[in-house]
Amino acid sequence: MPNPLILPSFAAGELAPALHGRVDLAKYQVGLATCLNWFIHPFGGVSTRPGTEFVGEAVDPAARSRLIPFQFNTAETYVLEFAHQKMRVIKGGSGGTAGDGGYVLEAATAISGITRADPGIVTTVAPHGLSNGDHVWIEGAAGMSAINRRRFAVTGATATTFELADTDTSTWDAWTSGGTTARFYTLVTPYASADLPLLKFVQSADTMTLAHPGYAPRNLTRTGHTAWTLVALVFAPGTSAPTGLASTNPGGAQSYVMTAVNDESGEESLASAAVGAADAVSGVVFTPVAGCTYYNVYKHKNGIYGFIGRVKSGSTFTDTNIAPDTSDTPPIQRNPFAAAGDWPGCSTWHDGRQWYARTDKGPQTLWASQSANFKNMSVSEPTRDSDAITRTIASREVNEIRFLLSLNSLLVFTSGGEWKCWAGSQSDVITPANTSLKPQGYTGISQVPPIVSGNSALFVTPSGRKVRDLAYDLGVDSWQGKDVGILASHLFEGMQIEEWAHARDPDSIVWCVRSDGMLLGFTYLKEHDVYAWSRHATDGAVESVCAIQEKNETALYLLVKRVVDGRTVRYVERMVSRLFADVHGAWCVDSGRRYDGWNVDPARTMTIAGSNYAAGAAVALSATGHMPFSASSVGQKLILRAGQNQVTVTVTAYTGPANVTATLDTAAPSVTQAVAISDWAMAGATLSGLWHLEGRQVALLADGSVQPPATVVNGTVEIPRASGRILAGLPYTCDLETLDIEQGPPTLQGRVKRVQEVVLRVKATRGLAVGPDVRHLTEIKERISENYGTPTLLATGDERVLIDPSWNSNGRIFARQAWPLPATIVAVVPRLEIGE
């Protein structure tokens, strides 16, 4: 008698083959044998990963770039693409230009002509300011549609013309009018391509500090989409010292200096030039400093200057033979990063200071700015609590500091261990006098930056093959952690993690770039003991990732190396949101683009009216709230939809901007007749703009229905039937396999068994095939009551499938999604029959 057995969760992800016999582990019961292109939700279910949207070509197709996130707030987020001595900016969002998300462009210049030649020549209305080697974006050209929404390299530039490098336009349709060209915004940087992996960054508001031991530290500052500056840091007080000091009683018996105190920041300047006085009862006059009301006065005694008073207002100080306080002296200028060999390799902010660490000459040394004065490294003798700080790790080995991370203590990660930098008490503020460095462990970190998740840190060990977490343990008063990748150690055999990014919302997934180009997903939720790994393959190699917040979720951007039309290319792509409303919004292809002609404004409606609503009948089509028609609308197809009922029409004659005559391609259901409908679309049977996939076979989804694969020719694919939403991109397959079934005691291991039926509890799913293994799959039949001509709805609930009932020793269930459709499995219930 078959016995149902439920697998209610997969919260352990893919387990290493070495653990396939460890049925005694709690994680075994929620683990998987294969998890390819599925990711694990924190609640234990699994979903096929969303596809990626093509954002644009990378700066250099021949060299690897690096993606770095820049986030001012949740509404203003960017991805910075660093290439060899260049940086380009991608605005967070979806689309091809900064207006709707994509590469940021400079101001556009109108086009006055484009030749049909090899290479094509573009003429602009006004001087374009372009130089040879620049990249430009062209769009809006009438006639020569093949040139639109594409990137081109500039060569042969004159004041108002330029050639399109390596682009033969002689076979394209002739340009007739219009169009604009805009240069990709590019910032020149000093960083060579080979040095990008070691470039460290930390951001505060609109400023990002970049550190690398081979370059002077710099601040990258944003003031607008196309307004970025990269400036070497100058480590000196921002407040100027008073000038024009003079004594009312000149002489050499006494000597005075003054400093200015900034009204806003409280920063104290360096000391002014000294002025002499004849005796101890003298006046000092000076020229005030803009932005400063207070001035400190210091008098010389036994070789040092000591504090004697403050000028609160005015420009004169009178000394009445005040004894100098030599425990309070003026700041002494210091710049520890003045020359090559002294440039820091990492930075962060902590406890009101900016911290730096790891120079070639001081690989284990930390430096901190003055409190609240981030570019001021000045000190005093004796020291003040607000002075800059210098500390060097004292350890048995010289292990370079690689990262600084601010949590409730300053964590210092070296190549050989983890240290805590603190004041000796959690309630105290770090000062030069109480700074303490205490070891927390001796694992070490790779060159991959640590990630903060909640109040824990994740880091990659120096080998690149292990991931550990680190969290404060009150019981032992220390930072403790464990290997969180040990259950999936097979994913790192012979491979290393080279980059990663944390997509916090909605599923808290750390996306890791493996050295072979495979993308790994790590669902991590420490408080619920969720540590789940998965593998994600694309038709290419992932080389860089970063994550930025976009609206209510975190978007992952990827640099992917692909082969297209026989050429190696590198593309920036964006993982699309999986929070879609229905199958029409699903995006399950890679490097994809989509045409979307569906109306989104409920005030804009379409109405068909006539005496006959059979297929082939003529009707009047009118628009309310908008005027979408023109003479060129003849031949345009439209779809009007009311729930599961829809009708397709073809425009046959133009009457006016809001009225046309049309023919019904299909019979109009009664609910669509003579009714204003807001759910309508301008339909098409082609999708253009796919030049980045020229010659590749792509998967297609049109209005929620899978179409036959098609090959991209001249940047275009065709589908059999006009649709309002067409998605095209590279296909990928999603495979899921459970572990050997265990129901003991007594154990089922080694006993023959078979599964005749399996129940998949699914959510928003379509297109799954299931079986005992990859060679014996049965596709789930899901269409039930949908109207003809409408897509099959996504299923939620239990799907019962009779599968190949062969006897075997494992009782595994294999599920595959081979179509560009979504699937989510929340539980698997096999009906198990056990033999001897």
Task: Pin down the residues of each PLM region.
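Extracellular fibronectin type III
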Residues: 263-278
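Glycine/proline-rich low-complexity spacer/linker segments in large multi-domain proteins
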Residues: 339, 732-778, 828, 835-836
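Short, surface-exposed beta-strand/strand-loop-strand elements in extracellular ectodomains
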Residues: 88-90, 419-420, 424, 767-781
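Beta-strand-rich modules
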Residues: 251-264, 296, 319
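Small/polar beta-strand repeat architecture
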Residues: 4-26, 96-203, 211-213, 284-341, ...
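Beta-sheet-dominated scaffold domains
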Residues: 196-201, 353, 361, 395-604, ...
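Beta-sandwich interaction modules
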Residues: 190-200, 342, 718-720, 749, ...
